[in-house]
Amino acid sequence: MNYIYYLCLQMKKLFNIAGPCVPGEHYMIPALERNNQAERLIENKHYFVIHAARQTGKTTLLKSLVQHINSQGKYHALYCSLEAVQGIDNPREGIFQIVAQLKKALFFEDVKAKEVLDEIRTDADFTTLIYLSVARFSQALEKPLVLLFDEVDCLGNGTLITFLRQLRDGYINRDKIPFAHSIALVGMRNIRDYKAKIRDDGKTLGSASPFNVITESFTIGNFSPEEVAS
């Protein structure tokens, strides 16, 4: 018997409170079974928000979704954490860093379409950089793109507004120009909380609010007594 495989068989599962849970390594309730509305929203081409408190399983859910979606072969799902963009309010810098995180998320993926991101100039207009990156990548893929952005809370207000405006531009024009089939924005706040936070800082969103791109949101609840008992 392979020695490493033998060691894996001998490993005991652990309770995990530091980062996403891994099936086979940690005691966990299957994330997709508890949050099956995510698949429905993706199938219906929605852009949506998942919000919940810390350590409630958001990242575990996203990673489970990526694995499940890609195993089915219908869509290409990509997980992208925006934690490294934390606190960058200037969109000229923040938007460039978001694209850098997209490239990082694709680095180890065997997807030829990722090469199109390298063709986009680093000095491109920041007001269209996200839009062009997602549009070109979507066009180069052989399957519809599902983007799962984690830690959206980290974005500074200026970066967040510019980021969402470009997603909205892609959303409303995707009948003519390829763009993401579905996008999830994940963090601790609901979309209404983002709007309130920015308005409290005295910034106007205008009539074409970038938050109008979001069609639905849901939260991850606490475990039920039945789930704990299982």
What are these regions (language model features)?
Residues 2-56, 60-69, 132, 136-137:
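Walker A/P-loop-proximal flanking segment of P-loop NTPase domains
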Residues 66-75, 92:
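Non-catalytic architectural context of zinc metalloproteases
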Residues 101-149, 153-165, 173-182, 210:
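Mid-core helix/loop region of P-loop NTP-binding domains shared across ATPases and GTPases
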